[in-house]
Amino acid sequence: MRHISPEELIALHDANISRYGGLPGMSDPGRAEAIIGRVQARVAYEEITDLFEVSATYLVATARGHIFNDANKRTALNSALLFLRRNGVQVFDSPELADLTVGAATGEISVSSVADTLRRLYGSAE
């Protein structure tokens, strides 16, 4: 399983800001390491092998962690999709992704529900 680094998470954010605008930066760069650490700890301790569950964990942790000054939801979605692509899953844009990301960020949609939606959209990685 190929994970995302804190530096890549920050680069995803910076690319979003460059492309779509918004307030750059973050209050504490160490928080990117904390988000990535949270994902990797969950994967290790819960022995998660399902790519969609891990991808959903990236999305929820980043969106709810609110580590950037702006573009947290965009960065969260991009991190989830990057993780899937990096691990051999073909991804594409879907109108469902915006509502999914907002629901995950607000806590209305759980990690497992995010994973179910990603699995339905992008199919089995096995």
Swiss-Prot record:
Residues 4-120 form the Fido domain. The keyword Transcription applies. InterPro entries: Doc, Fido, Type_II_TA_Toxin. Its EC number is 2.7.11.1. Keywords: ATP-binding, DNA-binding, Kinase, Nucleotide-binding, Repressor, Toxin-antitoxin system, Transcription, Transcription regulation, Transferase, Translation regulation. Changing residue 82 to P: Loss of toxin and transcriptional regulatory activity. The keyword Transport does not apply. Changing residue 70 to N: Loss of toxin but not transcriptional regulatory activity. Disulfide bonds: none annotated. It catalyses: L-seryl-[protein] + ATP = O-phospho-L-seryl-[protein] + ADP + H(+); L-threonyl-[protein] + ATP = O-phospho-L-threonyl-[protein] + ADP + H(+). One of its GO terms (molecular function) is protein serine/threonine kinase activity. Interacts with cognate antitoxin phd, the exact ratio of doc:phd varies from 1:1 to 1:3. Interaction with phd prevents kinase or phosphorylase activity on EF-Tu. Interacts with the 30S ribosomal subunit. This is Protein kinase doc. It comes from Escherichia phage P1. The gene is doc.
